[in-house]
Amino acid sequence: IVINLKTIIYSSVYIQHDLQNCFQEQIRLQGQVRLLEHRVKQQQLKVVQLLEKKEIQYSDRGDENSVIDLGGKRQYSDCAEIYNDGHKQSGFYKMKPIQSPAEFLAFCDMSEGGGWTVFQRRSDGSQSFDRVWTDYEEGFGNFVLPNGEYWLGNKNLHYLTNQGNYTLRIDLTDFEGERRFAQYARFGVAGEEQSYEMSCGEYSGTAGDSLTGGFHPDVKWWADHRGMKFSTRDRDNDNYEGNCAEEEKAGWWFNRCHSANLNGLYYKGPYTAKTDNGIVWYTWHGWWYSLKSVVMKVRPADFQPNIV
């Protein structure tokens, strides 16, 4: 009996030792699983970023059928020059502003007097505007369809507006079919060294003055977008303790954070979210209504349409 008891005791000790080893091995394997999950998430993020870059480089940059042929006789600095040279059809044209090192493609809106260079369009939510700094710098989106969503690129927007005095016009449409607009004098975007800081002058229009924070002083001090640098989720230049671009899912000239965010998520009208991250124009529909379509476009302030 004594021998059997000793055998049982020794066996229980070995079993406890084996159990302890199993627990330690389990802890080690759990740590490896967490490490692998972290690495997988990192790789997934890299894949998403590479796909976004690939979209910028290869997709939707226009083909020969979507670009209006001007015959190669001269280079144009913007859509105003194209219009006054007799090309009255809205569509995609190649242009080269004075300081731009290369030609680029942009949509020319020949309505409202003609000569408008479109640098942003929202129409159906088909493009993600929750992008990193280089995406917004170089431009992205659909450069084929006449109503395709795109961002022309902060570099190109700087080259355009640095040529002289430009007027900004913003056309807005809600899901009830109502259309309004906002227009700003002396619109400009600084260069890369100033993080593409935005400036604008006097407002006119029917949508309300959201770019300067609206009319209410309790909103204006933290929501005025004038003089703000551009921010993206990976380049935070706002005045907020957190990261506006990350919270609002967009690149924009955020303050603390916004009274206008036309690069927000595409909802269909009224929406509910943790933050007011829709396509927002506060002075028209407030922060919790996302607009159906937006067009942002510029034209020289001294533009005189050639009717010939």
Name what the model sees in each region.
Residues I1-D109, G113-G114, P305-V308:
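Assembly "stalks" and propeptides
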Residues V67-R226, N306:
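Extracellular beta-rich globular recognition domains, centered on the fibrinogen C-terminal
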Residues D130, E137, N237, E241-G286:
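Glycine-anchored, exposed beta-strand/edge motif detector
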Residues H216-E247:
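Extended, non-catalytic structural segments that build the interaction scaffolds
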Residues D276-V308:
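C-terminal helix/juxtamembrane-tail motif
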